[in-house]
């Protein structure tokens, strides 16, 4: 009997590889626990005559998995299951979970299937499961957001980090459920910063799912992730890493892999596409602006102030959309600072301001001190000294600061025109009592902008290093994300990259509650530094706590998995 030809064998092998699909990006912090297999379209019903939105209707930078219309069992139109809008990938694991919730009657068998403890104990997840069941029966156009696990670390406590949802899909929420697919393990009590108190899980041999209620789901994709603390019910003993992995990430014997958790979010009802006569009346997404500009301020009656505002925004960038924080001033604290009244018409006071490039804080009187909303006039006439020698010096300072600003590379093209207009508007008419105030405002603004752009010029290489994750941040000492590439380590097979984190920021006095574990030694050093004492090594931001990492490596022609301590920075502090 003649065997298959070589070309047929090659085609068969290529077909097998194509059926296997392209492997998805692995979870960097779970090398021994790969993600679930690629999901086919089994159980996802796509009707042939549905008019889906074109690819351009989805916002750029959105998730790889668009909004899908699915059903759970049955075909559309036969009344067996309503249409469900799902944002994200609905794998076979989540599909089985939704099927189980839909058909549950919440008897003892169903409680055991979801790992719920006896009804005598308070179950935070049970009302949410029943609410999800009601949504599956009558979706009312609401979308179900499915977030998959991106990263996990096991020590000192499990930290689960999930995908970040689209803007507007995570706040506010009607429901947030953490769904786990368990393996063998004991009954446990689970606590965590994102959970509404302690919750009990009672898995049995018949348990296919575990569900935890989440009241602050944003912790699942911000920072280091959702922290879970599991202890045995009764004696409160902690579980080992192997026990945690076996319980939380059950094994899928058919695919030789582990089943990773998912976070299900149910935002409130909103306007969504609705089917009608085999068509979809789609509501396209608004095209996002790449560089959102702030709302233009109300036109000012003073062209000088309007031009100065435009110059500052052009050189410093648009302000944030959040409202500016109010400056709470403590009168007792202000009493300790050098202060005094400054007469802006006094040449000596203006000369002191000219000699200093420090920022200027102007405290305006409260609205009650101004009669009928009319600004109080400046006191004191404009002297001849201001009109002669001091005015020339102010003009010289203006021209010097403006010339230096024009010479900085990367200056916006509108800055030169705004500078020329400001110099023409200031100090104004000789008889204008606001001339000295305008001169001070313009001078301090130009000095501040010049100082900032000088710093940008000097720290250009440092910013390039900071983009690579090697420079120190200007904020307070805190934990920053840092990805480490292990591909240069030839002995390490998995993971290729992982989130190691790093500590960056400044150490100053007083220490804040960001780093509550500071010691007396660093407090004394920071106080000495604040008094101007020279220190050979000033306090710096360093990791103060670490977690281990599971690595799969190749050594002497053997593949081994071992736990390496102190691989992930979990806390930072000044030392």
Curated annotation (Swiss-Prot):
Marked site positions, Cleavage: 466-467
Major localisation: secreted
Location within or outside the cell: Secreted
One GO molecular-function entry: type II transforming growth factor beta receptor binding
A Pfam entry, by short name: TGF_beta
Assembly and oligomerization: Homodimer; disulfide-linked.
Name of this chain's protein: Muellerian-inhibiting factor
Natural source organism: Sus scrofa (Pig)
Organism classification: Eukaryota, Metazoa, Chordata, Craniata, Vertebrata
